[in-house]
Amino acid sequence: MGSTATETEELENTTFKYLIGEQTEKMWQRLKGILRCLVKQLEKGDVNVIDLKKNIEYAASVLEAVYIDETRRLLDTDDELSDIQSDSVPSEVRDWLASTFTRKMGMMKKKSEEKPRFRSIVHVVQAGIFVERMYRKSYHMVGLAYPEAVIVTLKDVDKWSFDVFALNEASGEHSLKFMIYELFTRYDLINRFKIPVSCLIAFAEALEVGYSKYKNPYHNLIHAADVTQTVHYIMLHTGIMHWLTELEILAMVFAAAIHDYEHTGTTNNFHIQTRSDVAILYNDRSVLENHHVSAAYRLMQEEEMNVLINLSKDDWRDLRNLVIEMVLSTDMSGHFQQIKNIRNSLQQPEGLDKAKTMSLILHAADISHPAKSWKLHHRWTMALMEEFFLQGDKEAELGLPFSPLCDRKSTMVAQSQIGFIDFIVEPTFSLLTDSTEKIIIPLIEEDSKTKTPSYGASRRSNMKGTTNDGTYSPDYSLASVDLKSFKNSLVDIIQQNKERWKELAAQGEPDPHKNSDLVNAEEKHAETHS
């Protein structure tokens, strides 16, 4: 029994070192050995009661420490905002960050049940086939013809600088419909999942009607088209599309297209405070996000819009699970918990969970405009601020206090964007690039070591698609993925935009809506420097 006691004392001296280091597994092995030794001694009747009590108490303390540490790791989001000091960030901006990106609506923190992980086999040959088909142009398929102006605009759809506003103008305010159809065609989703073209067009048009229902300045069909294109860019240029199955790519594009369907132009908190029907329906939990998914799926109950009619039962269920998780993850109040969970996953030896990674991609795309060119970013910011101010007007009419950034007379636009970039956008895109590196680098290394690639991989590496003007699209094989360039480009653009906001903040935060000269000057400056 002495050896057991000695080992216990030694373990006590190293417990906390192991808990915070990389030798946690070793600690558990030693603790397991002690407990098994005690069991054997109990069986033999050779037990020292004092040592037995000491070891059991110690085992309990270790388990309790681990439980507390794990609970704190999963639930504590306060530290994510701990570096927002009152003397460096205006109180209004700090309140907005806290109220928007954390769940602090008077609800008790409660450990959420771990969602079942969605696991599927990565079909390499299948992936190779769909990538080879991506750039097969089908501009004049039955049911949808592309106007010449739309064809010209969509030539830039693979670029980060893609101008969705130009597409919306070229398409007669149907940017979402053409973006959905374009990507479903490029990824060969129509053929692969036997999607009736008439259903796809009817569904896309119904989505546009829903996005236009409340005439929102920001959360409208243009935003949906922008997020969908951004998701496409991320999948394409990080190589993530090589990691995903065709069903998962369908889920990504579909979720992006519907993620803000029938958005009311007001926040979840506004719905909760006004006790709206949708807040009552969803019990104040991710109110709008639940509605977006539910309403979009309700459309597909109509036969003429049922784009998923030919999916197998398993595929339909798997896709729905993915779409629900992705869209609910766009609830900004879960931002810090989502970031923390992914960051913790990166520290684990096993691979990243597909559904959670896909959710991160959609979330990043949803808040990506500060990482776009100043011309686009500034335009999106002005639209979002006007939407906030319209909510503030409603709050004033109802006698409610102004939500953060919703008072058009006092809101500091530049400061809010600086805070948004510092505490939300930069960490999100940093995590996105770290995640894609962990996923894709092993795939690139494996691909380069394969002397005789599979049929699909071989066809994928040589894939080039012919465009309308007879030229070739770029090579988007695994070998062509340049994660360093992807990361550096984002960092540079975000930094440039932040500096521009700092310049505006230094000018004294003029009201961008009352001072039209400022807005016009900014847009002219953006045009000359874009």
UniProtKB/Swiss-Prot annotation:
Record flagged with keyword Protein biosynthesis: no
Stretch list, region Calmodulin-binding: 24-44, 114-137
Cofactor remark: Binds 2 divalent metal cations per subunit. Site 1 may preferentially bind zinc ions. Binds 2 divalent metal cations per subunit. Site 2 has a preference for magnesium ions.
Keyword Flavoprotein: no
Extent of Basic and acidic residues compositional bias: 510-530
Disordered as annotated region, ranges: 450-471, 502-530
Residues of the active site: H219 (proton donor)
Sequence ranges of Polar residues compositional bias: 451-471
Binding site for Zn(2+): H223, H259, D260, D366
Organism superkingdom: Eukaryota
UniProt entry keywords in alphabetical sequence: Calmodulin-binding, cAMP, cGMP, Hydrolase, Magnesium, Metal-binding, Zinc
Top-level enzyme category: hydrolase
GO molecular function: 3',5'-cyclic-GMP phosphodiesterase activity; calmodulin binding; calmodulin-activated 3',5'-cyclic-GMP phosphodiesterase activity; calmodulin-activated dual specificity 3',5'-cyclic-GMP, 3',5'-cyclic-AMP phosphodiesterase activity; metal ion binding
Stated family: Belongs to the cyclic nucleotide phosphodiesterase family. PDE1 subfamily.
Name of the protein described by the UniProt record: Dual specificity calcium/calmodulin-dependent 3',5'-cyclic nucleotide phosphodiesterase 1A
Gene: PDE1A
